[in-house]
């Protein structure tokens, strides 16, 4: 299971911990990923996706999974999310 959001493509970043004495040690910034079930109103079923907290807020802001996927770029979406987007286009 990779540490990448299935809807936005957000993944780990690298950087430094910086102490008060300005010592730098390498570290990773991991995305806040959660396993959530999102309901597709058009298809009438729910899908379990591993998405970031920011993506969950974006889905709510756009009015649900169907609206989010309609506007999302294909390059950012995972294979599973692309499959759902194609199913929505057919329906």
From Swiss-Prot:
Q: List the disulfide bonds.
A: none
Give the residue ranges for region: Disordered: 1-23
Which InterPro entries does the record match to this protein?
Answer: Ribosomal_bL28, Ribosomal_bL28/bL31-like_sf, Ribosomal_bL28_bact-type, Ribosomal_bL28_sf
Q: What Pfam families does the entry give? A: Ribosomal_L28 (PF00830)
UniProt-listed GO biological process terms: translation
Q: What GO terms fall under cellular component here?
A: cytosolic large ribosomal subunit
SUPFAM superfamilies membership:
L28p-like (SSF143800)
Keywords, comma-separated and alphabetical: Ribonucleoprotein, Ribosomal protein
Q: Which GO terms describe its molecular function?
A: structural constituent of ribosome
Tell me its family.
Answer: Belongs to the bacterial ribosomal protein bL28 family.
Record-given protein name: Large ribosomal subunit protein bL28
Origin organism is Paracoccus denitrificans (strain Pd 1222)
Lineage of the organism: Bacteria, Pseudomonadati, Pseudomonadota, Alphaproteobacteria, Rhodobacterales
